[in-house]
Amino acid sequence: MTKKFVGLIILDGLGLTDQKENNAFHLAKTPYLDYLLKNFPNTTLKASGEEVGLPQGQMGNSEVGHLNLGAGRVVYQSLTQINKAIRDKTFFTNKQFLQAIEHVKKNNSKIHLLGLISDGGIHSHLDHFKALFDLLKENNLANNTFLHAFTDGRDTGTHSGINYIKNLLDYGFNIASVAGRYYALDRDNNWDRINLVYNMLTSKQAPVITLSLEKTMQNFYNQGITDEFITPFITDPNGLIDDNDAVIFVNFRPDRAMRLATALSNPCATNAFCSEGKTNFCGNKLVNNLFLVTMTQYNVQVKSVVAFEKKTLKNIYGEVIANLGMHQLRISETEKYPHVTFFFDGGKELQLKNADRILIPSPKVKTYDLKPEMSALEITNAAKTAIFSRKYDTLILNFANPDMVGHTGFLDATIKAVQTVDSCLKEVLNAIFAVKGKACIVADHGNAEKMKDNQGNPHTAHTTNLVPFIVTDKNVVLKPGSLCDVAPTMLDLLEIKKPQEMTGNSLIKKLV
């Protein structure tokens, strides 16, 4: 390790609010965070809306947060880009969408829209489904179009799926199948869940429901099953995916969509995100001559055409460190591993020089309220070993607990999650202090500080609240800012000049 070390500790989903009721952050016993806030320079950061490249008033999320944290500039998001394309009508002349239409017409086949039906704006948006349906109607394909609806219940209300389904039916959609995001959009290598949805879409291996969609959804609710956990079912057996069909995956955020997209487009791929090495879809029914469009680039294993390419970000934090010959470490558990790697690196799969990664498996539980400590202790132990090795100049670490447990809507479990992170944070920072290093502590967005909505129902979504930022250097004074200012601040602490591409500013107002 060189004479300077700076670690970035991301407390995922830990926002700030004056509202104390149903606030897991306030109700938790956090003696170490209390100590840090009392004894070290701290400020607040904006982590939502236009300050992170989202539409005004749009809640932040982990992808957006880590992009801005690592890029050191406001990164305009896919949601903003696609919304603009709809407004200026370029959406309706998009080359990739038109290729899918041509494929369907040439093969006299079907076109399928897959994705999270939600206006949460985190992974997808209802307006994008409607714009695509408008385009398909213009091309006389309304009767060939089938929607496979993945219900949300995390970034939106737990029982809001029924209203989104009504909305889409009223718009004219033919909904062929439904599945909760727990099954369709898993990102923790639970391939058995993805397999259920894959087989439903391609092999009709799921219950066929004859009741109305509204009654079917209400039956789930009556059984205590919320939108996230709706088990896959078919409403139109003739609307499933066959050879020569086209699929448009409407999710613009890749981390939860990439596994099902890989299964559909490249089922025998070897995947970095699959610990077993294979997707295990080789033995399933394969769909031949499938034309797949993804809204954005998911990953290299997904064989698709991409409707909206992202602007390449140059001289992000990780690249600056690598180009100087310095050593860096990224560490997280499975749920947030893409965030400290892919997203923190500007939405790219980078192989940076002298950059190591540690992936700690997330616990195999149905929901994280059953194990609110998740893998925080294992992350802590691995981080301490790495820090004491004195190999690294900088560390990027994510504690997922406040966000992932917050998404369950269970207040007591989320309080335990926050308390776990508090104790683990103390151990990590004590290790950093022992090697004469400094730490920046930040959250990427809010969540755990609001566990019930205004009607008293569980609140499982993110918030637009400010987030804390702490620097363990008593010789500085901080000013408020946004997430894009964190990377310049870290470079400032390392006494490295920020590159011109970083338009964020150091939050260090002056030395004391």
Curated annotation (Swiss-Prot):
Binds 2 manganese ions per subunit. Mn(2+) 1 binds at D403, H407, H462. Its EC number is 5.4.2.12. Its cofactor is Mn(2+). The active site is at S62 (phosphoserine intermediate). Coiled coil: none annotated. The keyword Manganese applies. Pathway: Carbohydrate degradation; glycolysis; pyruvate from D-glyceraldehyde 3-phosphate: step 3/5. It holds the Pfam family Metalloenzyme. Substrate binds at H123, R154, D155, R181, R187, R253, P254, D255, R256, K336. One of its GO terms (cellular component) is cytosol. Mn(2+) 2 binds at D12, S62, D444, H445. GO terms for molecular function: manganese ion binding; phosphoglycerate mutase activity. One of its GO terms (biological process) is glucose catabolic process. It catalyses: (2R)-2-phosphoglycerate = (2R)-3-phosphoglycerate. Keywords: Glycolysis, Isomerase, Manganese, Metal-binding. Catalyzes the interconversion of 2-phosphoglycerate and 3-phosphoglycerate. Belongs to the BPG-independent phosphoglycerate mutase family. Monomer. NCBIfam families: pgm_bpd_ind (TIGR01307). This is 2,3-bisphosphoglycerate-independent phosphoglycerate mutase. It comes from Aster yellows witches'-broom phytoplasma (strain AYWB). The lineage of its organism: Bacteria, Bacillati, Mycoplasmatota, Mollicutes, Acholeplasmatales. The gene is gpmI.
